[in-house]
Amino acid sequence: MRAARWIAAAGAAVTVAAVVTVTTTTSTTAIKFPGLPASAGSLTFHEGDYLWPKGHKGTEHESNAAAAAAPDPGNNLIYGGGAAPGSISQTPAVYLVFWGLQWSKTDPVTSYLQKFFQGLYGTGDDWTTVSREFCEGVATGEISCPAGVPHVGGPNGPLLKGVWFDDTLPAVPLTAGVLNVPSIDQMGAEAVKAAAHFGNTTAASNTQSQYVVALPSGFLAPGEGYYCAYHSAVDSNYGSVAYTNLPYLNDVGSLCGQNSVNAGAAGTYDGFSIVGGHEYMETITDMRPRTGWSDSGGQENADKCAWISSGQGAMGNLTLSTGTFAVQSTWSNTFNGGAGGCVLHAG
């Protein structure tokens, strides 16, 4: 668990680089967040929910393939008691941010991610439907949702509401064996900056929205402690801003999903839809980690089904109007007669 951290942005008007003070229990440090509007006010950063690479100890639900099919109501997700609206996404909206001047608009990853989010909720999508059993506004600890409460739903219009190439350099890439990865504070500040860019400067405009911040190549390398992605939230004058940190996954190849479903060239970008989809499905059911749906051990719907390669809940393809994309399964409390399990396609 990561404790919340409080940040105050100086100034009363939009600034080119707001200077903020990060206060922790041990130190106070001045940091610059380039382009962060002062109107964002004080920022409070919350814990992230991490997706670890294949084979990382403790990442996968113990013996995932077996657990996916094992009838056990004790495995089910429970409601965390968060405020409604805002614990789940009733009308999801995605804003895609390519952060860093190293990005090229011709990089195939940029079009792959856009097409993936553009295709969801359209023809052929029986994958996001799995999430619609979850809700908000029920008692803490509930494992089911009555018909009369707000459920996870579909978007108003297209899911992908905007795309932004932010050509600010977020951090120094891998140099001389030293990996300088943007901190959770820097990533959260970029999400708030993106909210301002898209005009979402009220709490209401961010209640259902999430910002997928994609990093360019050079910010992810194999080693102890690295992750494939995470999602989190940051509180600001714009409300609570939910976001995903999505690194350039092909920097570590199959460890974060490349060719996990499709062989050869067809699977080059598998990781981006598997991991991007993992974080998306977690965010719409747990917008602010642990306020929505997770199990007694803190695992969210996609964590419980990560990297299953065979049997019930195995990763597979999702064919949409915009293309074919590799995705993983997510947890359903209603599967197996209420015992729960990992489901790729809603029945």
PLM region spans:
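Active-site recognition of the HExxH zinc-binding catalytic motif
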Residues: 96, 274-286
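Acidic glycine-/aspartate-rich tracts in secreted/extracellular proteins
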Residues: 102-103, 218-220, 289-290
